[in-house]
Amino acid sequence: MNYRELFTGGLSAATVCACSLLVSGAVVASPMSHEVASEGGVMGGSFYVGAAYSPAFPSVTSFDMRESSKETSYVRGYDKSIATIDVSVPANFSKSGYTFAFSKNLITSFDGAVGYSLGGARVELEASYRRFATLADGQYAKSGAESLAAITRDANITETNYFVVKIDEITNTSVMLNGCYDVLHTDLPVSPYVCAGIGASFVDISKQVTTKLAYRGKVGISYQFTPEISLVAGGFYHGLFDESYKDIPAHNSVKFSGEAKASVKAHIADYGFNLGARFLFS
């Protein structure tokens, strides 16, 4: 088992635990929990806002691309040795069996949330943004050529049997409803937390936005810096329930006869860690 499998497996287990903890926290709501919240300075029944820097790593597998409504297509990548981009020349697409890969997002990956806390239980509405640029599978003579692919109806490419798709990135903007539980302590400012969420992701592939049902798990710790401010560090996993993306438009239809659109079947998820803060309003 590699580290990614261990990480995602742990978060899956945490998601199950979150559901149980939320139910027990909401139903029990014992006097002890209220006493803990009061003594620890985290008052129940308060609104909060949060923000986090969340470096993310893509988990994009089985990126199967083909012509829309066709069972079989062939995907060819641009020749690495060609120093110019000319998609009208079939011979420039010399790499058979080409598939796209995507890089990690360490810069433009952020989360923001607004929520309500009551004792150790919290519910929040969270928005996030992820951008994963296309990753070159080696050194290309022309920058950006790794974003181009020719989709053909036959194994051999000709002037009239292909169109060109350009995918230079995948972006995922999501809105999630999370249920969280904080394990509060009377004598420590540090509280472990676990969250489980469901919501919508808006996935942009080549300017075609597709809405998907999404899920998210989060685990971490919060440190009560002041009664109103908590510093947060943790990990997350974000996945989608469906793998189908249709009507990806052609970058250039060249001399292709027919509707130049592609479909993609891919498991698109991301995981990573977050560093941020929550601001409580009494």
Curated annotation (Swiss-Prot):
InterPro entries: Msp4_OMP-like (IPR002566), OMP/PagP_b-brl (IPR011250). The keyword Coiled coil does not apply. Keywords: Signal. Belongs to the surface antigen msp4 family. It comes from the Bacteria. It comes from Anaplasma marginale. Residues 1-29 form the signal peptide. This is Major surface antigen 4. Pfam families: Surface_Ag_2 (PF01617).
